[in-house]
């Protein structure tokens, strides 16, 4: 059977090149704090583990081990066709722990469109692969090892060193990996009228 969920990343992953990262940690915090629970896996896992869209679309919650603090990207899910293990940071664990974790992490491709609609409604730019690029840039500022980040991201050390080193400071990276859920986070709602394109968040029309 053809993988329908995987089709959404055809353009973004056909030629994965380094691009824009999220400009400020406040922007990521804003969109995470506004997101309903169903969009949090895409946002939090993308921002704090750097998993590719294609890999995320094929990921099952059984591969997310909060006790061991790892996400297993199996060979059939990875772009490079080789298994890798991605660490779960403390703040990513805080985002994932309250969620219902059964079945596919991304159950429908509509979730990606809703993330784009949410960012647009909040006035936040959403370049292609922005979460992955942001993660790699901030992660290398923390661990200071292109080899380690390459293993985690499923990329080559040469690419990491050439394109992502010194794009951000350690202080900025520390703020990125300190973004945590806010009180009442689970009550967020977000709807997009498919006919009119109007966005309603927490009962209020945004646009």
Give a label for each model feature.
Residues 32-40, 49, 86, 94-108, ...:
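Short, basic (Lys/Arg/His-rich) helix/loop patches that form interaction surfaces
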Residues 68, 90-92, 98-102, 159-162, ...:
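C-terminal secondary-structure termini that scaffold catalytic or DNA-interacting sites
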């Amino acid at each position: 059977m053809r993988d329908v969920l995987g089709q959404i990343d055809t353009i973004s992953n056909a030629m994965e090149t380094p691009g824009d990262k999220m400009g400020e940690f406040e922007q990521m915090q804003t969109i995470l704090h506004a997101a309903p629970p169903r969009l949090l896996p895409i946002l939090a896992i993308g921002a704090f583990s750097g998993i590719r869209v294609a890999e995320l679309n094929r990921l099952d919650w059984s591969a997310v081990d909060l006790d061991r603090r790892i996400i297993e990207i199996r060979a059939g899910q990875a772009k490079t066709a080789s298994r890798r293990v991605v660490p779960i940071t403390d703040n990513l664990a805080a985002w994932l722990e309250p969620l219902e974790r059964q079945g596919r992490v991304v159950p429908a491709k509509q979730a990606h469109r809703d993330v784009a609609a949410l960012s647009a409604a909040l006035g936040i730019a959403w370049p292609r692969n922005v979460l992955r690029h942001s993660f790699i840039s901030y992660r290398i500022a923390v661990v200071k090892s292109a080899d380690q980040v390459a293993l985690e991201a499923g990329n080559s050390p040469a690419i990491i060193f050439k394109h992502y080193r010194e794009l951000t400071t350690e202080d900025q990276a520390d703020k990125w990996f300190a973004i945590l859920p806010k009180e009442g986070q689970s009550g967020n709602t977000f709807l997009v009228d498919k006919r009119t394109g109007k966005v309603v968040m927490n009962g209020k029309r945004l646009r």
